[in-house]
C-alpha cells in the first residue's frame, strides 16, 4: 500500500508552489562590505521584498551562512543582534504575504569540516538546536527549516547521520515546524533517491535541477573548465546548432558534453522522463517534494533558450505537483535587474515562470 502524504506537510507545501532564492544577501556575500549591517541594509531593501510579492511569488528561500554567527558566538550562544536581524527579515517577508524557507547555506570549507570532524558535526547539531529555538516563534505555517544547502559530505551514510541528528534536535526545539530535507552532494535527483526512508513525517523532501550543466552553466567561471567552451548552446537541443558549436570547440571534454547534450535531445518530454524517478520516489514514501534551485546563468546563454528552459522546467514541476524556487532574485541567474534599491522585474522571465506580475 502506497503511504499518503502527512496532512501537515501536504498542506504547507501549498505555500511553496512558486518561489525565488534570496541569494548573496546573508550568504555567499561577494561585496567587500562582507557580512555587515551596511551590506544587509543595501543589498535587499523593502522595495525588493515588495517587488518579489508583486511579481507573483508565494515564497522565498532565505539563504543564510552560519559561519558569521558561529564566528561571533558559539554553537550554543548565537549572537543576539545577528539573530534579531534574521527574525526581522522573516517578519518583513511574512508581512508581504511570503512564506520563508530558512536555508543554511555555508561555504565549502564549512561543509568539508562536517565531513572530516565529529566535533564539527556535534557543533552543527548544537547550532541547529539553538537556532531552531530562536525561530520557533515564527509562524510554522509559513516558515520552513532547510538543514543544509548542497551538503557535499564525504559519504552518503555520514550525510544521512548528520541530517537525521539535525532533524531530531530541530524537532525538540521547534516541534511544529516543517523541515526541508535534501540529498547529499549537489542535492540532485540521484542523491534524493539515496536518502533514508523518512522517520519524521513533518518533512518535505527537496532536490535541485541544473541538468545539463553544459546548458545551464555555460561560461560560468566556477563550473568545470570545459563549460567555458559551451557558450551559446541553445535549448531545446538542436543537432544543427550543436554542430555549429562543435566546429569551433577544441576542448575534448567540452566536445563530449556537447555530443551528449545533442544525443539526449534535451526538451520538455525528456525532462518529464528525467523527473519521473523523483516523482515515483515521493509517491513510494508518501512525501511532498520541492525543487528549490533551478535556473540558467545569464551572461552567455542565448536569451530565448534561457526563457524556453525556465518555462519548461517551471511548468513541468508545477504539473507534477512539485513546488519550485528559481535561482535567483538579483544575482547571475536573476529574475530582477538593476542596482540596489532600483531593481525592476525582467518581465520575460516572470512570464516564462507563468507569473503575471
Regions found by a protein language model. Name each.
Residues 42-46, 272-275, 307-310:
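Structural motif corresponding to alpha-helix initiation and N-cap regions
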Residues 5-7, 11-178, 183-191, 202, ...:
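Active-site mouth of glycoside hydrolases
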Residues 100-102, 289, 324:
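Hydrophobic beta-strand scaffold residues
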Residues 37, 221-223, 304-307:
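Short, surface-exposed loop/helix-turn segments at secondary-structure junctions
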Residues 299-357:
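Aromatic-rich peripheral "rim/lid" segments of glycoside hydrolase catalytic domains that contact
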Residues 2-10, 16, 118, 122-267, ...:
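Active-site region of glycoside hydrolase catalytic domains
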Residues 31, 215-219, 328, 336-337:
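Short conserved micro-motifs at the rims of enzyme active sites and ligand-binding pockets
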Residues 36-37, 41, 231-232, 267, ...:
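Gly/Pro-rich active-site loop or hairpin
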